[in-house]
Amino acid sequence: MGWETVMKQQKLVEKMTIEEKAAILSGKTVWQTREIDRLSIPSIFLSDGPHGIRKQAGAGDHLGLNASLNATCFPTAATIANSWNQDLGEEIGQALGEEAASMDVNILLGPGLNIKRSPLCGRNFEYFSEDPYLSGKMAASYIRGIQSKGVYACPKHLAVNSQELRRMAMDAVVDERTLREIYLTGFEIAVKEGHAKAIMSSYNQINGIYANEDKHLLTDILRKEWGFDGIVVTDWGGSNDHVKGVAAGSNLEMPSCGYDSAREVIAAVQNGKLKEADLDERVGELVDAVMELTSGKKLSDKNFDRNAHHQLARKAAAESMILLKNEKQILPLDTKKSIAVIGDFAFSPRYQGAGSSMVNPTKVEDMSSILQQYDLNILGMTRGYQRNGDVDENDRKFALNLAMNADIVIFCFGLDEISESEGLDRTHMRIPQNQIDLLQDISKVNENIIGILSAGSAIEMPWHTCCKAILHGYLNGQAGASATLDILTGKVNPSGRLAETYPISYEQTPAFRYYPSNEKTSEYRESVYVGYRYYDTSKVRVQFPFGFGLSYTEFTYSDLIIEEDGIKVSVTNTGYRDGAEVVQMYVGLPNAIVFRPEKELKGFAKVYLKAGESRQLRIPFDDKTFRYWNIKTGQWEIETGTYQIMVGASVADIRLTGTTERTGNSKGYPYNPAKMPYYYTGIVQKISDEEFRELFGHEIPNGRWSGKLGINDAICQMYYAKSRLARLIYRCLTKMKKKSEAQGKPDLNILFIYNMPFRGIAKMTGGAVSMEMVYGIVDAVNGHFMLGVKKIIGGYFRNRRNNKKYEKILKGAGGKCR
């Protein structure tokens, strides 16, 4: 934005009344900002869309309960991360931007790049990786693509938002080094390299401060350190104290909560709790964004090339699928052999997750409908098992008979819809048992089983010996079926590599004893040892390591050259098929003074090679290659030493190793190894209070609920309420929640309410409920029924009257706002 434009926006802000300034910082509807007609400041439209646009045609709601317009459903972020292809990410971003523009969407709420701290997070399908470097690079590519079409990307959720349980009322207790190195680095890359113009703050607290009110996070780090010059948007209903948010650097509270927050802002300016300069700065940043997104904007093409985007979704899915196993080269399929296709997922594919990201696709392929397009000898097809876990004995017998008479069985299975959803964490890593029972029975009558997996996060795989081949599609979008068959038939050579580790069991995971949380807090005792950083350092054997994936060809590595600013390495396709390899560069410092993982991903490159072709690749070092966060000095530093540079096909398959000397700039090391023995070994599953306190640098907050409930306590905490009515409501909500789970489809509305704090009632009702009324509700819950009812009734009429007054003020009718 040029200087003249900036000055013009400043003049606009100067012309605004305080009522207009306060009002514009909260939404007008579920998805729209507030316009100021008097000054020709228009409204803009925000929409979900990490992997497809979810613009609702009618009344808007946060969780997608009302139908949305048709849009391309691309593979989810967890899937695309397995491609390790930034060019592909940018291409998908461009398509998302085109579709958003065609629907007059100004800000696309994505991508999501929270770290996969635990496989149990119900929203892992929306996130890229357990590794911040890979997450950041892939997010930056999406952002560049989206914003090239005149639409803002809004990466989310800043920060440390790694669980769904009580996500709006949870305090993440995490040390500053872990925060910086693991949970903020991906966002740093997204801002610096993707040049994101919007950021969504997370629901949770970070060390006792709500992310949206954390000035250290939103101003000191985001704006000053990273150079962010866009707007910060709350997650929907995620504003706790709007005044504190504005002071900290947050620009837009969503969705609409009427004028309650605006009145709070005005009162805060009048009583000196909020500087008017801070208010003007937030308004100026928001107005800059609004005018940039709307000024001189051409009428967008209401149509996008649906077929081209479908083919892009197919290409993306094919490049992101991982071949985990291929014994005796059973794949690609021999077209002469008879094939039985078994599994409900072949008829009703699971191609996306549940929640606010759910897309209404332009079309959806399923394997059963498109098999005839391929030259395959299909003996027959059947579901074999019931999606909801029930057993149909006739269908099961038919499946076994079909398998017995076929040369090869394609078995389609995975996690069902209730297993992964926004608002709901998983309780285990297992695939539904009825699917595994059938798989094991089939393996007794046919040893040639090809397993086709659908799941948005890591799963336990004790049954893997039943399959000769396993192709993992993750949640591969609307064109996933054709992408799967392209790989099975050899039309496409698989090149996906895991962006997360697959442990043998959940009990192996580093946060096993700490996840998801205590009642009020979630303690990040595992520190920097997340994912492969833990397994690799503590020598824990896993099922499939980070970065792993097979191909129909073979690659060799040679001629590693380590230079001052990067490495060069030659890669050769030694097989008989064209294919792609993901070359991964890891860095470690043996015998480091400051504890650290044995190796960390610091660079990667995907290269396409014809059979017999060789190519030299260059992977540069950057400002993140050797750094660590020194909590003692509060800055990034480099430790002096001989660093190992390890190049390979996965974290466990290092082909070439070299060293480089680095002179550090440490001004004093932060830790006493004698007080932190387990952090220095990486064995972090049983960290004591004393050792975590040493890492954290403060007393550990009490994570238990106690005393009466407050506005920031979750509604599910009404289990402890003094009011019988409140406890009855809790039991009803719990019963409804369990009923939806038993039916195999999560009730997103119930899940959202269940984990929502009481203040969310005011933030999510469009101005119908004020904070005064919420305090009345809490009084009633705590047993003060009459006092609560009095506040609710009085608050209702005062809120209604004050909202009408505010409307008149904005329309220029005069009067004062209370």
Where would I find each of the regions flagged by the language model?
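Glycoside hydrolase catalytic-domain context in secreted enzymes
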Residues: 1-624, 642-647, 651, 763, ...
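Terminal connector regions
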Residues: 623-670
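Charged, amphipathic alpha-helical linkers/stalks
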Residues: 652, 658-728
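Long, low-hydrophobicity ectodomains and other hydrophilic envelope-associated domains
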Residues: 694-818
